[in-house]
């Protein structure tokens, strides 16, 4: 996470930080440069008391807007993303999101669904980007995600390789 902070948190084009959890304290260890932080509870936090100082007030999912794009973030465990990401994507489409970001699998993933793509029992009504940044702390290939919200579309990418410090 420190590498992500050093690379991106001081960039004037960085709008904020999305933290898809399993470890709410991770961000307290680095300088976030005063950026807004959007975060959701993970399955680990489900085992904490609902009013614990670590998890209190942090939602299970969150919808917000940046640059005209509607972004839905969730950890993903409640939608079974380890088995199939499409259920979470159906929900995001129902919420009229432009971008769905989820964690839980600790594996990088990205998918672009153009208008008309079959999803469940219907077609997607507008383009939807689906993105999992992976995990900076666990997994075979530590990674983090970078999402570039441009007027002409969304670019999803991963930074990975070697040990992330």
Map each language-model feature to its residues.
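N-terminal active-site segment of His-dependent metallophosphoesterases
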Residues: 1-34, 52-54, 58-59, 143, ...
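Binuclear metal-dependent phosphoesterase catalytic core
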Residues: 5, 67, 95, 118-165
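A short helix->loop->beta-strand "cap" motif at the edges of active sites that frequently abuts
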Residues: 14, 35-36, 125-128
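Active-site neighborhood of phospho(di)ester-bond hydrolases with catalytic His/Asp-centered motifs
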Residues: 16-22, 38-43, 72-75, 99-104, ...
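Short beta-strand scaffold segments in enzyme catalytic cores
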Residues: 62, 109-111, 143-148
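Active-site environment of divalent metal-dependent phosphoester hydrolases
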Residues: 1-3, 24-28, 44-49, 79-84, ...
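Helix-adjacent hinge/juxtasegments
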Residues: 36-83
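Non-DNA-binding regulatory cores of transcription-related proteins
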Residues: 86-87, 92-94
